[in-house]
Amino acid sequence: DKLDGQEVLFPVALPGSLWEESGRYESVGSELLRFTDRTGSKMVLGMTHEEASVQLVREYANSYAKYPFMIYQIQTKFRDEARPRAGLIRVREFTMKDAYSFHTSQEDLEQYYQRCYDAYNRIFARCGIPEVAVVKSDSGMMGGSISHEYMLLTAAGEDSIAICPECGYSANVEAAPSIVKNENTIAKEELKEVATPGTGTIEELCEFLHIPAENTAKAVVYQRNADDSYVVAFIRGDLDINETKLTNALGC
């Protein structure tokens, strides 16, 4: 409220037409719970409420004089998590405070973002929770140029973060830039076809050919949600593809 926010309460069940308009009805995966009402109209259980907030604003905030402003709610959210586990760590139904601000310029948005950032820092400090790391993160399906996560450091967690004790930089590994050392000293040879029967993994291939994993490459095939097209990504055999960075690079 000190940020001049106005509290609202959006419906849990939302018209699928709003999500179709934004494109997220198709682009969001199975985490979005979809169903139809008795008339056959598409409905969803809200995992976030961007579409609902935009619908509200475009109906009632039809004058520049009403901007900027922020609306927020504390509401039940639903996500059909593939691996719900560990109590509050990953659940299908949870309570979340979400806020949506509207501005007439990018500069005003960035200034307000900093106010929200400072407010969350004060909240955690007031609650006396010391083991909270503020890290840069990927904006995911929400998009945007910058995003932060407040992560509680615990052995029970499932995310990994990178923190530099020298400069204070911190980021989720999904968003942190990295440099791969090119230490491949393999001698160049003529291209030739080699039979590798019964080698379904990089480990089996390396054992069969008696070579290290960094001297191999693997291809991983993905299917886009939006248009069902395929993407083939190649990476060195001893590394794993960062799917978040791949998604951002492809713009999908």
Question: Can you say where each PLM-predicted feature lies in the sequence?
Answer:
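Active-site loop/lid in soluble adenylation, ligation, and acyl-transfer enzymes
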Residues: 1-81, 214, 222-225
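TRNA-binding/sensing appendages of the translation machinery
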Residues: 1-38, 100-140
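Short C-terminal domain-edge/linker segments immediately following a structured domain
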Residues: 39-43, 75-78, 102-107, 120, ...
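Extended, low-hydrophobicity, polar/charged segments
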Residues: 50-55, 59, 85-99, 107-252
